[in-house]
From Swiss-Prot:
InterPro entries: DEAD/DEAH_box_helicase_dom, Helicase_ATP-bd, Helicase_C-like, P-loop_NTPase, Znf_CCHC. The keyword Ribonucleoprotein does not apply. Disulfide bonds: none annotated. This is ATP-dependent DNA helicase tlh2. Induction: Repressed during various growth conditions, including nitrogen starvation, and by heterochromatin. Repression is strongly dependent on cul4, raf2 and raf1. Derepressed by histone deacetylase inhibitor TSA. It catalyses: Couples ATP hydrolysis with the unwinding of duplex DNA by translocating in the 3'-5' direction; ATP + H2O = ADP + phosphate + H(+).
Length: 1919
């Protein structure tokens, strides 16, 4: 063969410049060609077959030269050129290719070892790919070497790919034979020829990398040790030392640096490599720059290819530019991770400020738990009192005990904030002391004195939040000691000195916050606020604290604080001292109580002990370190430290030794007792299991998402099927969102589901930035798909680039095409030129639409929120929210990723941080997503995330903002998911899907319960479900715990077992399309298999003993049947558990058989039941005597339908029309119906607007003594509600007291038990219209969630309010309305006000109405309280009323005085004749003797006028309603409605006509009534003289009297009634609200009631589910009126529902004869015979179905209302970097760098009115907030729990977004004022109207939210 020296003669000039000489294979060097030829003849390496004629010398002209430079740029360029010439020559001379390669190797491995040569050689190694390029001479050889698993690297070294090591080319054949067992028979000669290659041996590579200070490019194919150790002092000295073994590194530090420098100060992590060699005895490591370059350069176009068109060029350029954009982000990220340890941005002082005033809340709850409702647990309280008698201790402290533990303190220079800040610094200084101690010394401070082998002793706190919380607890104890009367002066003195030193340091200009940040450099990952710039999550592995020295002030402050802590925590008490007198017990006693004095649960109290115990131990450790530093003790005397009499024991260990009567001992023993109580206490009864598939959970009381209609004693029912519905609902939303985010692309075709199984993922790969996304070419090629889709689609292109045409885009990307090759070749140089990076970026040159980007980002944020919830629900047992927010997609600098691919699923492989912190042990927890969710998440990360990153870059022009999209799994509004967001996201998402607000804690309990009851079968100790949930099996079986056992090893089936756990949970949730693809093979346990075999053998033996003779066919048949039966049993047992009660009710009802009835319905009119009429008349007689009659038909209908309990009613009767009887009579009948000893009474809930009305109604009910009523439901709050619980018959409550969360839950419990008969709302028009009850109105819709009919009562209920009522309560109402609101017995008198004649006119009116006679009374209504005082003063001063007593009724009068005045006015024998009051007195006050009502000034509305005039003539006698008005009010007054103004200005309009049109929607007048007193406008007489009226219209001076109001019938109850329907009358009173037939007010007798037709023959479709006849009931969803409506008096809600589903028919207890003997349930037979019907199940079913639909409507309404605030919150998170004031001013403006507060548009104007001539303080506009937070403008429903609402520390999103000022600015903007006024203010553009609207809470949503949402969504359309 030809040796290398022959080819060396063809060396070029370039090669000479590099090497300086020619080298023969034997190693001899030559400087010219002649000498090498002579040497070749004598060289021993010369091949015998080679002759001298073969030696050819090439002329220099044939050499390849570099004309531009004397030296080559990179070695490969010269090498390839030389090789090309060599190959050409070899072809001419037919030389073997191997010889050419040998020559190349000889040239590149020159013996010249100058720096330039070495640098050029190692530049070539930047090509980390194998040397397989087409132009390389290694290509053919590498193809053949690949067959043996070998490859030649670009560093000219031979590598074994399988062993990942470099080989010496001489020993290659031996390596393949011995190590890989290959037989090299024919190829042995070829391996011997490889020896001629001059490849580097491993030794040469190590020698080349001998320097331990330089950083070399890493060698691809060899393993990289990412966490190697580098000696910092050696590196600074220039010598350097690196190693991968900690012990060796420690020996080096001790040997080289001694004990002067601590080991922690020497260590620095770095990436290392070593060349593995079989013959190397010791490993030599060298530092490498671990930055693998991505390939994927664009292939050059081949010659002869046709020119691409513009579209193809654009698409190719987009893909290229996008790939370059992603690579730049990757390299920037890796460079930051590689060497630039950026200073952390979080500030401990800021964190302290943010956590100020939260110590009490933090001590009362766990880190990831939600607050519980404050209720007293008597058993727990007694247990604690038995042990500690804390209640007595608190009593001795006095009434102001809560001030002792108040987290606020300022006394001179001693402030709480200063103490907390210095305590934080003290903790971190103590941590440094602990790091210098050995583990044995730290174990001396172990809690309890006992430790396991894994216990590290007293360790530093991992989380920064924990440090702050512990510091706050210790500070609170110090403040407690200072506040005590007998406070230790020493503690105060030291704290004052400490605060003084702190003040001096601050005045000196030192930055304490930066020092704290440096001290806190090793905070854990949970508290890392890295601003998404890097992936640092500093833990104890990287606690390189450089700032170890502090100045004198810091040292002085530290020493003074240490002395104060010693006095507080290192205490030893006298054994004779009572424990209750200790300061620590007094502190714990105060902390054990809520602010209202109720006891906390034991688990709430337990949070107080850990900070105090840890502080006590840490102070002792610091004191020991002080003794060591001062040389008072020697480390050699460690064994005697805990010996009594030693200095260490006397100063340190006696205070932390148990049994020595010290503070530590008291805390430790108290904690043990509390923990024992916790084990029996549970979790405050928050979860109750009803069945394996049903639970009851207790939601938070202050949740902004209330549970409507499903409460059981404040607990909510949840079925397993609802979890399935929750997952399916969220998954459907996520699918739709992904479709929108991908612009309706066919993602299934682009990224099929098979991709999950085809992508490879190296789980053990710890390379920086590695993730499985890099392993698939499909993924890498799909990053730019969405961007190319935008550019190709015209609609999308216009949406994102509205100002650019397609030609502009094509031209822009076409210009990049010419520079593509240069940019690829000079990529690194281009990237390093940061100054021109943004200018040359093509994406920054595009004119993007910021609104389109924000909308896209908002959708993506919603997607991430739902994806977070889906992962939390379906991945197995739920994880912790604090850990989920840090899950990453790729490997970071100090932690590996959490997202992996395994078993064809996405696997989340997280580490349990809490175990790591406590035990210093890893606890890896795998969770597997379902297959549908896996592919959906994968498509999102592959397609959408790159586009999000690009959009973030173009909006900010900052690549550091892009890293968060490439790193974290969940990104919200451009930031990593914050720690507090999950607690808002999860309840909101669950409420939107299933209308039940599941909190994190609720779901963790529920998931554990369902798992225990449906999946976990064996009581094994190691449960993979419990490991996923974060607790051990033993803990899970007791109290839901937190600690875990160590996992000593990972078995081979570790991941498979977790996969099985996740899959079983997903199977329980019935997740569809989730196959296992055969990966889960459930094998039978060997023991069970053995039992089955024995059973088969036993059966065979028994068969033989019996002697059965079976033919072959019978055997086969029997065997087939047996197998069939086994299969059926197996299939039945393997079916998933399904809750049969949770199916949709309507589906079950469709198949529920009903029993046939004994009669048939007759179409036509329906009539009331005879028995029901009897009962109504009997109850009426109990109230008003035997002669009482119903005043009108409508009144009877109201009573009767209320008794039926089948429909929701609106009863509109005139004042004095007997509306109260509609619930009093049914309540009395139901009370008599109850069965003694079995079922207790039904309850009626009555809501009234005013306290006076409540008192008046309760007084009237109590006077009769027939019913028991109560005005306070809270007295029964703590009573356990059952069917036998004795309750009042009536609850008469005000709106505010009943419509609270706790009140609604109480009545929901009653309704669930079937004991709530009806809900009555008196004066319902006020609830729906008046602003005084806006807060109550926001909760009024929840009344529809009660399983009881609604009954709205009012005398003034306009028809327009009917639609408002339907929308508010989400149901239809049946309306009972009298034809005219105006009363027939009242003379309506209108007269202009004359100040001089007013008193005289008043006296004249009082004489006409005989107020001065008998029990006559007069009421004067005034608009304001000033008017009341004015009239009252004039009457007292006037001689006309000298002998007349006058009283007043206003809001300023106390309750006692109001009640006294009202009693005096109502007393028939009293002297008080006149009541002067505001309109509050006009609501429902029932006094029959009011003869005159006077209005002093105009009422605000027609409803107020009708309501107040209705106080007169309630007994049916003649009365006058006089209105004195001023001309100004009727024209210009702002508080009077326009309708009232028009009415007064039109002198021809009849009063009754006006009231009828406004209230009833009818056109009538005084002449339309057959028997009425004409109004002043229809009468010729000024005052309507009675004689004139009588003469003109033939009526008596006084209307017919009726004894008592309202009511009466005959005393005969046994009258014979016909059971058959009466003949159809010609003209009957219809039920429809549109019926305008007049109805007589003549009392209705019993005989007339028996023939009354209650329902018309036809029903309008408008009133579905409200009324109907027999043949239309089912059509409109009504119950059958012919069936007895039996409520659940004897059964609970569950039994009632089960009976409905199972079709159980209840017996109908009919009652005949006298009411006095009533018992059981009264049937209501309407239009039927005497036979009993069996259709009660259908009746109750339809009623229950209507109720369920009503509840669903209310839930939807509530969700819609809360979703508006959630949308705005999400919007402001997205737009947090933009000034929205500028956006409102000019929607097309560019993104502003300033914030809203610094907006130049806003700085020059007033905050409120927007004017520039004054500032905020000088503004005359006065704004008063009602029901809103003064600092953010939100209602309490819109606040989160952590917002600290209604305080100056409010942290809501609205305050951060300046919502109030933004709305003010929009109103003061001319272009929005008219728009807002038309939308919300009926066109009123006055400032007073606007601020009155936005600053008062009217609904669940704040008006500020409604206004800004309307502007952003409907007007600007940017939401």
């Amino acid at each position: 063969m030809v040796v290398a020296s022959e080819i060396a003669k063809v060396a070029s000039k370039t090669a000479r410049d590099i090497a300086g000489c020619f080298t023969c294979q034997c190693g001899t060097q030559f400087d010219n060609v002649e000498r090498i030829v002579q040497h070749f003849k004598e060289c021993r390496y010369r091949d015998e077959t080679c002759k001298d004629d073969d030696i050819v010398v090439y002329e220099p002209s044939s050499f390849v030269q570099d004309e531009k430079k004397d030296k080559p740029i990179i070695v490969e360029a010269a090498s390839e050129a030389t090789s090309e010439e060599a190959c050409n020559s070899s072809k001419e001379r037919q030389l073997p290719a191997l010889s050419a390669l040998s020559a190349l190797s000889t040239l590149t491995t020159s013996a010249n070892d100058d720096l330039w040569t070495a640098r050029l050689i190692w530049q070539s190694t930047n090509d980390t790919k194998l040397d397989n390029s087409p132009s390389s001479n290694y290509t053919d050889l590498n193809h053949k070497l690949a067959n043996y698993g070998l490859s030649i690297l670009s560093i000219h070294a031979l590598m074994c790919v399988e062993c990942e090591c470099l080989l010496n080319v001489i020993h290659t054949a031996q390596h393949m034979q011995i190590v890989h067992k290959l037989e090299l028979n024919e190829d042995l000669l070829w391996f011997q020829e490889l020896r001629t290659l001059k490849l580097k041996s491993p030794t040469n590579v190590l020698q080349t990398h001998s320097s331990q200070t330089h950083v070399y490019p890493y060698i691809r194919g060899l393993p990289v040790l990412l966490n190697g150790y580098e000696c910092v002092p050696c590196t600074k000295n220039g010598t350097g030392f690196v190693h991968a073994i900690m012990d060796t590194f420690r020996h080096h530090v001790r040997r080289t640096h001694g004990k002067v420098i601590k080991l922690e100060n020497c260590i620095r992590r770095t990436a290392l490599q070593t060349v593995k060699n079989k013959y190397a005895q010791r490993c030599q490591f060298f530092k490498v720059d671990y930055v693998p370059l991505n390939g994927g350069e664009e292939e050059e176009e081949e010659e002869g290819e046709e020119k691409e068109d513009a579209q193809n060029i654009k698409e190719r350029m987009v893909d290229f530019c996008f790939s370059k954009f992603m690579e730049k982000n990757q390299q920037r990220r890796e460079q930051q991770d590689k060497g630039e340890n950026k200073k952390r941005q979080d500030d401990v002082d800021q964190a302290t400020d943010n956590n100020t005033n939260t110590i009490l809340e933090d001590d009362e709850k766990d880190n990831d738990e939600e607050e519980e409702e404050e209720i007293v647990n008597a058993r727990e309280k007694n247990l604690l009192n038995q042990q500690f008698n804390w209640t007595a201790i608190v009593k001795k402290l006095g009434e102001n005990w809560d001030q002792l533990v108040r987290f606020e303190y300022t006394n001179g220079i001693v402030t709480l904030d200063t103490i907390v800040n210095q305590l934080i610094r003290y903790y971190y200084r103590g941590f440094r002391h602990l790091s210098g101690m050995t583990m044995g010394m730290r174990r001396m401070f172990t809690q309890g004195g006992s430790y396991s082998a894994q216990e590290r002793g007293l360790c530093r706190l991992e989380q920064k939040d924990t440090v702050v919380r512990y510091a706050q607890s210790a500070a609170l104890y110090l403040i407690f000691l200072l506040r005590r009367p007998s406070a230790d002066s020493g503690i105060r003195r030291h704290l004052e000195a400490m605060c003084g030193a702190t003040v001096e340091r601050k005045e000196g200009g030192s930055n304490s916050s930066s020092n704290i940040s440096n001290v806190a450099n090793f905070d854990s990952a949970e508290d890392d606020n890295d601003n998404d710039n890097d992936n640092d999550r500093d833990s104890n592995n990287n606690n390189n604290n450089n700032n170890t020295n502090t100045d004198d002030d810091d040292k002085l402050a530290y020493l003074e604080l240490h002395e104060a802590l010693k006095l507080a925590f290192l205490q030893q008490y006298d054994f004779s001292k009572n424990v209750q007198d200790l300061e620590i017990m007094e502190f714990l006693a105060c902390m054990s109580l809520h602010k209202d004095g109720t006891s906390k649960y034991a688990y709430e109290i337990s949070a107080c002990f850990a900070p105090l115990i840890y502080t006590c131990r840490l102070v002792a450790a610091c004191e020991l370190q002080r003794l060591i530093d001062e040389k008072q003790i020697d480390l050699l005397s460690i064994p005697s430290f805990q010996t009594a009499g030693s200095i260490a024991y006397a100063h340190v260990f006696c205070f932390i030794t148990l049994g020595q009567r010290n503070l530590y001992d008291v805390l430790y023993e108290t904690q043990k007792v509390v923990r024992d109580i916790i084990r029996t206490e549970g979790y405050a009864n928050t979860l109750q299991g009803l069945s394996p598939s049903t639970v009851l959970f207790q939601p938070r009381s202050n949740s902004m998402y209330p549970c409507i209609g499903d409460a059981f004693n404040n607990m909510v029912r949840l079925d397993l099927s609802e979890l399935t519905a929750l997952y399916e609902g969220m998954f459907a939303k996520v699918q739709d969102l992904l479709k929108e985010l991908c612009f309706d692309m066919n993602v299934e075709k682009l990224l099929p589901i098979s991709l999950l199984r085809s992508i490879g993922d190296d789980i053990n790969n710890s390379k920086l930035g590695y993730s499985f996304f890099k392993e698939s070419i499909e993924i890498r090629s799909s990053h730019s798909v969405l961007l190319r889709t935008i550019l190709k689609n015209s609609e999308l292109c216009h949406r994102f680039f509205p100002s650019m045409s397609k030609k502009d885009l094509t031209k822009l990307f076409g210009g990049v095409s010419d520079q593509q090759r240069n940019e690829c070749d000079n990529y690194s140089n281009h990237y390093n030129d940061n100054s021109n990076d943004n200018d040359n970026d093509v994406f920054l040159k595009l004119h993007w639409s910021k609104s389109a980007i924000k909308k896209y980002e908002t959708k993506a944020s919603i997607f991430n929120e739902l994806l977070f919830c889906l992962v939390y629900i379906s991945a197995g047992q739920p994880a912790r929210a604090q850990e989920m927010v840090y899950w990453t997609l790729r490997n970071g600098k100090y932690k590996t990723r959490e997202l992996y691919l395994m078993f064809g699923r996405l696997m989340i492989y997280s580490r349990y941080d809490k175990t790591r912190n406590m035990k210093f042990a890893e606890k890896p927890i795998p969770r597997f997503l379902s297959e549908p969710l896996s592919i959906l998440a994968l498509r999102y990360y592959v397609l959408v995330r790159p586009l999000e990153a690009l959009m973030k870059y173009v909006t900010t022009a900052d690549r550091s903002k892009v890293a968060v999209y490439l790193d974290f799994m969940f990104v919200i509004a451009g930031e990593r998911l914050q720690r507090d967001l999950p607690y808002r996201i999860f309840p909101k998402a669950t409420y939107q899907c299933i209308q039940k607000p599941l909190g994190f804690r609720n779901y963790r309990h529920i998931a554990h319960y369902f798992k225990e009851k449906n999946i976990e079968e064996e009581m094994t100790r190691e449960s993979y479900f419990d490991l996923q949930a974060g607790h051990t099996r033993n803990t899970a079986l007791y109290i839901y715990g937190r600690t875990m056992d160590n996992l000593h090893y990972l078995p081979s089936d570790y991941f498979a077992n977790f996969f099985r756990a996740s899959y079983k949970w997903q199977e329980l949730l019935q997740i569809r399309d989730n196959p296992t693809h055969g990966l889960l093979v459930e094998t039978k346990h060997p023991f069970i298999k053995r039992v089955d075999q024995l059973e088969e053998a036993l059966n065979e033996k028994l068969a033989r003993l019996v002697g059965e003779q079976m033919v072959e066919g019978d055997k086969e048949k029997d065997k087939t049947n047996e197998e069939k039966n086994k299969d059926e049993v197996k299939a039945e047992m393997t079916q998933p558990v399904v809750n049969q009660d949770s199916h949709d009710l309507q589906d079950q009802l469709a198949t529920t058989p009903t029993a046939p009835t004994a009669f048939h319905y007759r179409p036509g009119l329906l009539q009331p039941s005879q028995t029901s009429v009897q009962h109504c008349c009997w109850a009426l007689s109990q109230y008003y005597g035997l002669e009482a009659k119903f005043r009108s038909l409508k009144q009877f209908q109201s009573v009767y339908f209320s008794l039926l309990n089948r429909m929701n009613l609106i009863t509109v009767l005139p004042t004095g029309g007997g509306k109260s009887l509609s619930f009093l009579i049914p309540a009395l009948i139901e009370k008599k119906r109850q069965t003694p000893g079995k079922v207790m009474n039904m309850v009626t809930l009555v809501l009234v607007p005013m306290m006076s009305l409540r008192q008046d109604m309760m007084l009237r009910v109590n006077e009769k003594g027939l019913l028991v009523c109560s005005g306070n439901w809270t007295a029964f709050k703590d009573v356990r509600l059952t069917l036998e619980t004795q309750l009042p018959d009536l609850f008469i409550l005000t709106y505010e007291s009943a419509l609270t969360n706790s009140g609604l839950r109480f009545f929901e419990s009653l309704a669930t038990l079937g004991r709530l008969a009806r809900v009555v709302i008196d004066e319902a028009h006020l609830l729906l219209t008046s602003g005084a009850w806006r807060t109550a109105l926001s909760r009024a819709s929840r009344l529809s969630g009660l399983y009881a009919p609604l009954h709205l009562l009012s005398a003034t209920f306009p028809r327009q309010l009917e639609m408002v009522a339907r929308q508010t309560f989400c149901t239809n109402f049946y309306v009972l309305r009298e034809t005219s609101t105006a009363r027939e017995n009242i003379f309506y008198f209108l007269h202009p006000y004359d100040n001089t004649e007013f008193l005289l006119d008043l006296r004249t009116l009082m004489k006409r109405t005989k107020v001065f006679e008998g029990d006559g009374r007069a009421i004067i209504f005034c608009r304001t309280k000033k008017d009341v005082e004015y009239i009252h003063r004039r009457l007292h001063q006037s001689d006309l009323f000298a002998h007349t007593h006058v009283t007043i009724y206003t809001g300023d009068v106390s309750d006692e005085e109001r009640q006294m005045n009202f009693d005096a006015f109502r007393n028939a024998n009293g002297k008080t004749r006149i009541m002067i009051a505001t309109k509050a007195f006009g609501l429902g006050i029932n006094y029959m003797g009011v003869r005159l009502v006077v209005h002093y000034g105009l009422p605000a509305s027609s409803m107020d006028y009708v309501q107040e005039t209705g106080r007169a003539g309630r007994d049916g006698k003649y009365a006058i309603a006089a209105l004195f008005y001023e001309k100004y009010d009727s024209t210009w007054s702002s508080y009077v409605e326009d309708s009232m103004k028009n009415f007064l200005n039109d002198n021809t309009m009849c009063v009754r006509s006006f009231l009828a049109s406004e209230m009833d929607g009818e056109c009538v007048c005084c002449a339309s009534f057959a028997n009425c007193v004409y109004c002043s406008r229809c009468s010729d007489s000024l005052l309507g003289e009675e004689s004139t009226v009588s003469t003109m219209y033939g009526v008596k001076p006084t209307l017919p009297e009726t004894p008592k109001p309202a009511i009466a019938t005959h005393s005969r109850y046994n009258a014979s009634f016909s059971s058959s329907p009466p003949p159809q009358p010609g003209n009957s009173s219809g039920m429809s609200a549109m019926n305008t037939n007049t109805t007589s007010t003549t009392p209705v007798s019993l005989s007339e009631l028996s023939e009354i037709t209650l329902f018309p023959s036809s029903v309008s479709p408008t009133w579905k589910k409200s009324f109907g006849n027999a043949n239309t009931n089912l059509k409109y969803g009504l119950e059958d009126m012919s069936l007895s409506h039996r409520r659940g008096h004897k059964r609970t809600y569950d039994e009632h529902l089960n009976n409905v589903q199972q079709g159980v028919n209840h017996d109908m207890n009919r009652v005949h004869g006298s009411v006095g003997g009533m018992s059981g349930i009264v049937g209501i037979g309407i239009g039927i015979g005497d036979g009993d019907g069996d259709g009660d199940v259908d009746s109750r079913t339809i009623h229950f179905a209507e109720y369920k639909s009503r509840v669903q409507a209310v839930k939807k309404q509530w969700v819609d209302s809360t979703d508006i605030s959630a949308q705005l919150e999400r919007f402001f998170r997205v737009y947090k970097d933009e000034c929205l004031s500028c956006t409102l001013g000019n929607p097309d403006t560019e993104i502003r760098a300033h914030t809203g507060k610094a907006c130049p548009v806003r700085l020059s104007t007033c905050y409120k009115c927007g004017k520039a001539d004054h500032n905020l303080r000088e503004c005359k506009l006065r704004i008063r907030f009602q029901g809103l937070c003064l600092f953010c403008g939100l209602t309490k429903f819109e606040h989160a729990d952590s917002d600290m609402a209604y305080t100056s520390d409010c942290r809501s999103w609205a305050r951060k977004a300046n919502l109030i000022s933004l709305v003010y600015y929009a109103w003061n903007n001319v272009q929005y004022r008219r728009t807002i006024a038309d939308k919300f203010l009926q066109g009123d553009v006055r400032d007073q109207a606007f601020y009155g609207f936005v600053c008062c809470s009217t609904t669940t949503n704040s008006a500020f939210v409604l206004v800004i949402h309307y502007l952003l969504s409907d007007v600007l359309q940017i939401m």
